[in-house]
Structure formats: C-alpha cells, structure tokens
Design a protein with these regions (language model features):
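Pair of pore-lining "gating" transmembrane helices in MFS-fold secondary transporters
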Residues: 2-21, 100
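C-terminal transmembrane bundle of multi-pass solute transporters/carriers
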Residues: 9, 27, 31-197
C-alpha cells in the first residue's frame, strides 16, 4: 500500500503546486496586460517573496507543536482560499495581499507534505522512487505558466483563476478524504501512520 499512497500524495501536491503557481502567474500576467510597469509588478511581488521566507522560517517550529494533519489541511485551506480570493478581489493591492497570504502558507504545506513523503520512501528505494516522484512534482507544475497564459486568452483572468482554484479545491478534497492524512500526528509519530487513504 506504500507505493499507491506515495503516488496519491504526489498527485495531490502536484495539483496544489499547479494551483498556486498558476494563480500567481495569472495575476502577474494580468497586471502586465493591464499596463502596470515592470518595476511596479516587482514591488508588488516582493511581498510574496518575503512571505515565503517567513512561512519557511515558521514551518519547522509549527510542525513541532501542531499535528501534521491539522497543519497540512489548515495551510492547504489557506492557499485554496487565497486563490479563490484572487478571483473575487479585483483591486491590485488586494490581490498583492492575497499573494502574500498564499506564499506564507505554501511553505508550511510543503514542509509537512514534503517531509512526510520523504519519511515514507524506503531507504533502499530512495533514488528510484524519489526520482520518479520528483519527476511528477516538477513536471505537473511546469504546465502552470502555459495553462495560465492559455486561460487568460480563452476565458479571461477571473475564469482562469477559478480554474486554478478548482484544482486546489480538488486536492484539498482528496486530502480530506484520506484518513491517513487527517489523522497525521507530529513528525515523531509518522512511522506509526500505516493506514491507507
């Protein structure tokens, strides 16, 4: 049951990565289309970079104090809510703040999810299985910029953002359906989590 669950996790996190990366790309491309200067876009996205550093710095401390399942689902819910907000909020400052929220929660989600995946890979198969999972996790998000551009041309900014929100919502739903993820404990307890999703 180990390999199917690893594939399940890879799919879920791949969908979340497409959702977040695609939403951010859609917003930036939309700003460029609206005529915002490159300098202003750079300033607006600087907050996202700072937020990612803050989220990464807090991820380790939080993972030691909060159960993995709670932290993972909460961070994922925040990222999905932020992508939905990007579709609902039309203002430039509002979208910039939502990107900050998204990029603050994403490192927490990645830290718990990535750490758990690494724990599940058998030592003797780390190279082969890890390489396959890395291919999936890098390959799926690589499509996000293309999807964002095509979406903007086909259905506009709002429609594209709702599409990426739907992907994130699907991933969140899959996570909620997995008892193994919902009940995931602290990192010290991960070895005991052996039930299939």
């Amino acid at each position: 049951a180990g390999r199917p669950f690893l594939l399940f996790l890879s799919l879920v996190f791949g969908l979340l990565s497409i959702s977040g990366t695609g939403s951010c790309t859609t917003v930036v491309l939309g700003w460029s289309r609206d005529g915002l200067s490159a300098a202003r876009i750079g300033v607006l996205t600087t907050g996202s970079g700072v937020a990612m550093l803050v989220g990464a710095a807090g991820a380790t401390r939080l993972s030691r104090r909060v159960r993995g399942g709670v932290l993972l689902l909460a961070a994922t819910a925040v990222t999905v809510s932020a992508t939905a907000g990007l579709a609902l909020v039309p203002s430039v400052p509002g979208r910039a703040l939502l990107l900050v929220l998204l990029f603050c929660a994403a490192p927490i989600m990645n830290a718990v999810g990535g750490g758990y995946v690494m724990r599940l890979i058998p030592t003797g198969m780390f190279g082969r299985v890890g390489g396959a999972l890395l291919l999936i996790n890098l390959g799926l998000p690589a499509a996000a910029p293309w999807l964002a551009g095509r979406g903007l041309d086909a259905v506009g900014r709002s429609g594209t953002l709702w599409g990426f929100t739907a992907l994130g919502s699907l991933a969140l739903g899959l996570m909620l359906a997995s008892r193994r993820l919902r009940t995931l404990g602290l990192p010290s307890q991960w070895d005991a989590a052996d039930e299939a999703p």
